[in-house]
């Protein structure tokens, strides 16, 4: 009898894809205190028909309430166990446009055991037709995460963070905002249903916290798990999630606009042309020259004198006042010599570096210099002074950084470790190294490598630490601008330029707020070398007239000597693009 009820409920939810209806058809009251007796294997392929994620090896109870054509269940997760709602200890209040659920006992061990605890949620239908809710939970142990389980969303291809569509078929997938590996630059997932409606799922955040989106395929739709984590450094025994939103629309742009309107308001994102933290020159860039110096192995692509020769030649092709020079590999062996951030000897030393910057600025160029925002070599002699800032995850374990094969042994190397800008020792060290280079050499901008890494951890909010670093440098060096790599939405409010544009399906959310240029690894003309970057080689793409990001030319060892015609062609196209944009970035 229960299996029939579950199947009927799931089919009914699937049939409600076309609209969000708060009332729904008249139905018999569900059993168990007004909740549907579903479990974790209901509505999903078990075992998975495609690639599967890890999950419980039994049917874990997921008692669910119906609202607006969808089914919702809730769990609270401590650092020791998973707890679901006891449906016999629940009160449910329904109104025409909302439902409130409050549970006073929790079940664990697959429903075999119970304990005291509170979980409550209010789901409401907004005037615009969206479902919004937040979940409150309280238990007698630190809360690790709070999960909402949604059934009834259609299957279809998925866009994550307004990036390219992917059809995952029967594969189960998990994505996270704003994690480093495969992370989302904004907490938005959109499903294009078979009815051609677009279903947007947003985490409406006012502080950066992990938001995970899991999609488990079934015959009639997705079971979608939405996971929120409070700050692991807080270890709260009572927590409230961010607000979640589900909205359906006839086109992707409508869903994206709704989400990014919230993002702009929440993080106070300015219009790029009006930004006070973007200097005037940054708003009038036609070109970025990415000049590669010393590789991890010690191989030098271009020393400082060669870089100056490149800049002198380029100044005859384009007005240097509209060109930013991005200096990377200037500080010794790339990554190996982090976090000293001192001028490398093999590329020419301080005298040659000072000459390069001075003469480049005399020509009219603007100079940006690369720093690692959260990477250090653990066997550096000075590492003990900053060792307390080594990044630990929410469980207290060191966050791994051994994913790059630097030395060619076909295995990731472990000499580098991730650091946490929320910790004063690292933030102060990095601030003083940036300040030293900026003040001594009159640098115009500083680039923060891997700035977009945010990990829930035991020591503090990495966004807050990053913003504090930027604010302190702005006070000391007005007009010297920060540049972010892997930028996520919240950082756009205080960092005006990024290294790779975001939101390709809704580009105005990026280019209306920040300027962007191509990545350090953007392949050079000719053989496609990525210079000091570990990728090695890629396919070179010439500059095109309608590209939204600032044209970027990578100079490696042979670019200036063998690829000058390709460079000249790219510069000519960049000038045409700049003119067509009215002299604006």
Describe each region flagged by the PLM.
Residues 1-16:
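N-terminal secretory signal peptides and thylakoid transit peptides that target proteins
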Residues 382-425, 474-585:
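Glycan-recognition surfaces
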Residues 135-137, 147-150, 327-329, 369-373, ...:
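Glycine-rich, histidine-containing beta strand-loop boundary motifs that form or position
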Residues 3-4, 20-35:
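C-terminal segment of N-terminal export signals and the immediately downstream linker at the start
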Residues 31-324, 335, 359, 363-367:
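Carbohydrate-recognition beta-sandwich/jelly-roll modules
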Residues 286-431, 441:
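Aromatic-lined carbohydrate-binding/catalytic grooves of carbohydrate-active enzymes
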Residues 331-337, 374-379, 453-457, 489-493, ...:
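Flexible loop/turn segments at secondary-structure boundaries
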Residues 418-492:
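Active-site neighborhood of glycoside hydrolase catalytic domains
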């Amino acid at each position: 009898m229960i299996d029939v009820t579950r199947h009927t409920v799931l089919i009914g939810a699937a049939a409600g894809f076309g609209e969000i209806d708060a009332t729904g058809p008249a139905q018999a009251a569900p059993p168990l205190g007004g909740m549907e007796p579903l479990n974790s294997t209901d509505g999903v392929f078990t075992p998975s028909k495609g690639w599967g994620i890890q999950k419980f090896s039994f049917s874990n109870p997921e008692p669910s309430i119906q609202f607006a054509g969808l089914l919702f269940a809730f769990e609270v997760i401590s650092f020791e166990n998973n707890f679901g709602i006891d449906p016999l200890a629940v009160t449910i209040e329904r109104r025409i446009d909302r439902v409130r659920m409050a549970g006073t006992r929790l079940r664990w061990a697959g429903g075999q055991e119970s304990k005291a605890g509170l979980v409550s949620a209010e789901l409401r239908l907004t005037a615009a037709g969206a479902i919004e809710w937040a979940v409150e939970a309280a238990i007698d142990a630190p809360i690790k995460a709070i999960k909402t389980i949604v059934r009834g969303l259609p299957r279809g291809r998925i866009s994550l963070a307004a990036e390219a569509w992917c059809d995952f078929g029967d594969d189960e997938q998990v994505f996270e905002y704003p994690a480093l590996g495969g992370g989302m630059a904004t907490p938005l997932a959109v499903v294009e249903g078979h009815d051609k409606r677009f279903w947007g799922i947003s985490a409406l955040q006012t502080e950066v916290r992990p938001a995970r989106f899991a999609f488990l395929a079934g015959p009639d739709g997705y079971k979608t798990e939405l996971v929120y984590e409070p700050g692991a450094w807080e270890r709260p025994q009572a927590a409230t999630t961010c607000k979640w939103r589900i909205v359906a629309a006839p086109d992707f742009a409508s869903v994206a606009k709704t989400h990014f309107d919230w993002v702009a308001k929440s993080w106070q994102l300015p219009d790029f042309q009006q930004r006070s933290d973007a200097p005037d020159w940054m708003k009038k860039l036609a070109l970025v020259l990415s000049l590669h110096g010393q590789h991890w192995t010690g191989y030098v692509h271009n020393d400082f004198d060669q870089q100056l020769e490149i800049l002198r030649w380029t100044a005859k092709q384009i007005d240097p006042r509209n060109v930013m020079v991005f200096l990377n590999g200037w500080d010794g062996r790339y990554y190996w010599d982090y976090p000293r951030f001192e001028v490398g000897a093999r590329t020419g030393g301080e005298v040659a570096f000072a000459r390069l910057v001075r003469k480049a600025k005399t020509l009219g160029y603007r100079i940006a210099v690369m720093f690692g925002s959260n990477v250090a070599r653990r066997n550096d002699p000075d590492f003990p002074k900053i060792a307390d800032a080594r990044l630990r995850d929410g469980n207290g374990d060191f966050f791994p950084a051994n994913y790059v094969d630097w030395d060619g042994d076909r295995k990731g190397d472990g000499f580098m470790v991730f650091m946490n800008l929320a910790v004063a020792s690292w933030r102060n060290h990095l601030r003083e190294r940036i300040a030293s280079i900026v003040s001594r050499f009159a640098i115009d901008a500083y680039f923060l490598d891997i700035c977009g890494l945010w990990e829930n951890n035991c020591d503090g909010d990495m966004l807050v630490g990053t913003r504090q670093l930027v604010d302190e440098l702005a006070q000391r060096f007005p007009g010297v601008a920060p540049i972010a790599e892997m930028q996520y939405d919240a950082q756009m409010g205080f960092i005006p330029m990024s290294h790779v544009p975001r939101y390709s399906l809704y580009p105005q959310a990026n280019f209306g707020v920040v300027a962007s240029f191509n990545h350090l690894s953007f392949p050079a003309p000719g053989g496609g070398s990525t210079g000091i970057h570990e990728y090695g080689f890629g396919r070179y793409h010439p500059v095109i007239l309608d590209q939204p990001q600032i044209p970027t030319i990578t100079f490696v060892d042979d670019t200036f000597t063998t690829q000058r015609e390709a460079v000249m062609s790219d510069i000519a196209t960049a000038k045409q693009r700049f003119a067509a944009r009215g002299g604006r970035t």
